[in-house]
Structures are given as C-alpha cells and as structure tokens.
A protein has these predicted regions:
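Hydrophobic, aromatic-enriched alpha-helical segments typical of multi-pass transmembrane helices
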Residues: 1-160
Length: 160
C-alpha cells in the first residue's frame, strides 16, 4: 500500500509507536533498549511514509526535504545506540522538520476537510516543537500533541 492512504496508515502506526517511546523514555531514559529498538523502527516507518506521501503529493519540495530530515533522525538514533547522549538532541532537532513536511500533507488533506487538516498540522507542530521537553522529563506534553495528531490521522484514514 502506498499513496495517500499508505502515508496516513504509516503515520498512524508511527503515532502509536511514538506514544510508547515517549512513555519508555520518560520512565527509563533515552538509552532504554526497547525504546531504541522502537526508535529504529520509527526511522524505517518514516522512510515508508515519505515514499508513500511523495507519490501522492507529487511536490518536489516535499521530495527534497524528506531525506535530510529522515537522515538526521537516523543519525540521532545511531548516536543513541552508541551511548552518545547528544543523539537525543539530534533526534529532537530532526523532528523540527516534521511540521515543514506536514505542511505539504496538510495542503492535500485540506481538500478533504479543512478543520481536521489544520488540527493535523497544528498538532504535528506542537509535538515536534515540544519534543525537547522529553529531555527535561516532560514527556506528557509531546504525548498529548501526538494523541491529537493521531485523532486527526484516524479521521482522514477513514475518508481516504
């Protein structure tokens, strides 16, 4: 499955995994192996979502911006596997690209339902920009934003 539906389903899966990762990191820290395994899986899911949305959106800017964002996230996860704490900052920095990429998805989703598309984009931004709070033990803040994003994604999955 690819295209818009594949990208949405992949994003739903990622949102659920992210909730688990946030809880694990909040309780056990960024070097907790099960969390690292899930972070690694998230990089693979990100590649699938990127390829799916790329084919559905057909926007050159989306196509060009995805690899650096995913690559930075992969580098951060690799650093965490190596026991380097700065990997967490690299992952958080990579997620700042999510709302930028999400804007291109938003434009497509707005043709289905403008308000839910705005909820999707706003919650993606709130999640991405609050992710560094996890490093301070405030994992519930990005988790709440991720839950709202998940609700918006589920709305669209049922309509595509």
């Amino acid at each position: 499955m690819g295209g818009l539906g594949g990208g949405l389903w992949g994003s739903v899966a990622a949102a659920v995994v992210i909730l688990a990762v946030l809880g694990m990191v909040g309780l056990y820290g960024v070097f907790y192996r099960p969390a690292l395994v899930l972070m690694t899986a998230l990089v693979a899911v990100a590649v699938f979502v990127y390829l799916s949305f790329s084919s559905a959106l057909g926007d050159r800017r989306f196509y060009l911006l995805g690899p650096p964002v995913i690559g930075l996230s992969a580098a951060g996860v690799a650093l965490l596997w190596l026991g380097r704490p700065e990997g967490a900052g690299v992952v958080a920095a990579a997620y700042f690209g999510e709302p930028v990429l999400g804007y291109f998805v938003y434009r497509r989703l707005a043709s289905i339902h403008r308000l839910w598309a705005l909820v999707f984009l706003a919650s993606a931004a709130a999640y991405a920009y609050s992710l560094p709070a996890v490093l301070l033990g405030l994992w519930a803040v990005p988790a709440a934003a991720d839950l709202v994003k998940l609700a918006a994604l589920l709305y669209f999955v049922r309509r595509v």
